[in-house]
Amino acid sequence: MLLDQLVHHAPQFRVPLLKAAFLFLLVGYGTKMGLAPLHTWLPDAHSESPSMISALLSGAVLNCAFLAILRALQVCAAAGQAQFCQKLFVWFGLMSMAVAAVFVLGQTDYKRMLAYSSVEHIGILAFGIGIGGAATFGVMLHAINHSLTKAALFFVAGNILAAYKTKSTAQVRGIFHVLPASGLLWVGGFFAITGSPPFGPFLSEFTILKATLDQGHGAVAIAYIALLALMFIGMATIVLRMAQGRPSSEVKTIQPREAVLAIMPPALLAAAVLVLGIYIPPFINTALHDAAQTLGGL
C-alpha cells in the first residue's frame, strides 16, 4: 500500500499491532541509522571505510533510515499514537547522546571519534522528533547541518590519514604545521559539529532546545545540554591536541603537500555550514517548514 493509503486507514488499525509494528521498524531502521544501543556496527564501519565512503554513510545513509522511521511515525500519528512514538524517540535520543559522549572520552582513533559523533547527532534528531512542535523544524535543519559538517570532517580525516599514515590520535600532532589548510578545516569542523556559533548546527540545536524549554520539559532540557557539553569536552581534548603540538620528525621529513582537490570539497561544505548558521535561504526554509508541518510540527 502507498503511504497515503496507510495514513488514511490508520484510525482503523488495531493499536497493539500498530505499536508492535512501529517497535520492529524502530529496531530495524534504528540499527541502520545508528541509534544506541543498536549502533555497534557504525564505529567499525566508519573507522575501516575510506573517508569518502564514511562521508557518504554519515551524510546520506543515516538520514535515509531516519526518514523511513519518520514515515512510520506519520502512520502512528494518524492513528492517534504519536505520543507513544515520541516518548520512545526522546529516550532513544538521550541514550544515543549519552553513549556517544561516554565512548568519545579517551577515544584513540579519530575516525571512530567522528563515528560516535554521528551517533550523538542521530540521537539529537530522534530527541527533537520526540519533543515535537517547533523542534521538528530544528530537526529537519539539523539533518542538513550534520550531513554537511560530518562529510567535511571525514574528508579532512582522509587528508590527515594520507599524511600521517595512522588513525591513532596519540601519533597525530601539529596538523597546523604539517597541513595548515586541513588543520583549519579540522578545528573549524570540530566547533561546527559540537554546536558552536556561528555555524549551522548551533542554530538547529538551539531551536530544539528552545522548543524543549517552551514545552516545559526543564529536566529533559538540562540532560540535553549536559550531554552536548560532555561531547564538546571529549572531542575538544582529542581535536585540539591533534592540531597543536610538534609533529614527529618522520612527518616533517615527508612534508606532505595539500592538493587543491583535497581541500576544496571540505572547504565548500564548511562554507555552506557557516552560511546556514547565519542565513537560511528562502527555498530551504520553505522546504523545511513544509516537512515539519507534514510531521505535525510548527
Predicted feature residues:
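Cytoplasmic/organellar membrane-interface segments at the starts of transmembrane helices
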Residues: 49, 179-181, 232-298
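Hydrophobic transmembrane alpha-helices and their helix-loop junctions in integral membrane proteins
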Residues: 1-206, 210-241
